[in-house]
Amino acid sequence: MTDYLLLFVGTVLVNNFVLVKFLGLCPFMGVSKKLETAMGMGLATTFVMTLASICAWLIDTWILIPLDLIYLRTLAFILVIAVVVQFTEMVVRKTSPALYRLLGIFLPLITTNCAVLGVALLNINLGHHFLQSALYGFSAAVGFSLVMVLFAAIRERLAVADVPAPFRGNAIALITAGLMSLAFMGFSGLVKL
């Protein structure tokens, strides 16, 4: 049980995919202008990352390794992610049309989110078993969502703040992301993975 807790805390805070591994920066910068959009994208990404991690582990363990097709791992994982994203898009469209319109083009772009593929590949490279793979995917997604929601809240505050003209827009957003990364670096001694 302690191992799972350490894996969760380590993945969410210490080895955050956005601020430490620099994966998933496109949606991090693109969808984080409004808190509501960031929360919706975070939920969709959490669902996709968790399900894609589980499916990728199953396909790797039951199909690719037994058939000695591990050289197709990346291609297979991309296909798995595309299927999971299409499934997620259908679910979001049916359950929350407002969120579907709000996310717009960013929902299909989860397919190209390198953090989702990174989680699937890192699960295999780190030698996680099924439960660890599911928890690692969920933890990475929680960390991604946490950072995106925090960043969106800060960006909403910055939109009404008196920021000097040269720093308005993306410049202050990048500075803020750097400061957030430094803040998360404070967790680096918390857990050793």
From Swiss-Prot:
EC number annotated for this UniProt entry: 7.-.-.-
InterPro entries hit by this protein: Ion_transpt_RnfA/RsxA, NqrDE/RnfAE, NqrDE/RnfAE_oxidrdctase
Described function: Part of a membrane-bound complex that couples electron transfer with translocation of ions across the membrane. Required to maintain the reduced state of SoxR.
Organism: Salmonella typhimurium (strain LT2 / SGSC1412 / ATCC 700720)
Pfam family, any one: Rnf-Nqr
CC per GO annotation: plasma membrane
Transmembrane regions: 5-25, 47-67, 72-92, 102-122, 134-154, 171-191
Family indicated by similarity: Belongs to the NqrDE/RnfAE family.
Keyword vocabulary terms for this entry: Cell inner membrane, Cell membrane, Electron transport, Membrane, Translocase, Transmembrane, Transmembrane helix, Transport
Classification via PANTHER family: INTEGRAL MEMBRANE PROTEIN OF SOXR-REDUCING COMPLEX, ION-TRANSLOCATING OXIDOREDUCTASE COMPLEX SUBUNIT A
Lipid bilayer topology: Multi-pass membrane protein
Assembly description: The complex is composed of six subunits: RsxA, RsxB, RsxC, RsxD, RsxE and RsxG.
A Gene Ontology BP annotation from the UniProt entry: electron transport chain
Locations listed in the record: Cell inner membrane
Protein name per Swiss-Prot or TrEMBL: Ion-translocating oxidoreductase complex subunit A
Protein's UniProt keywords contain Electron transport: yes
Predominant cellular place of this UniProt entry's protein: membrane
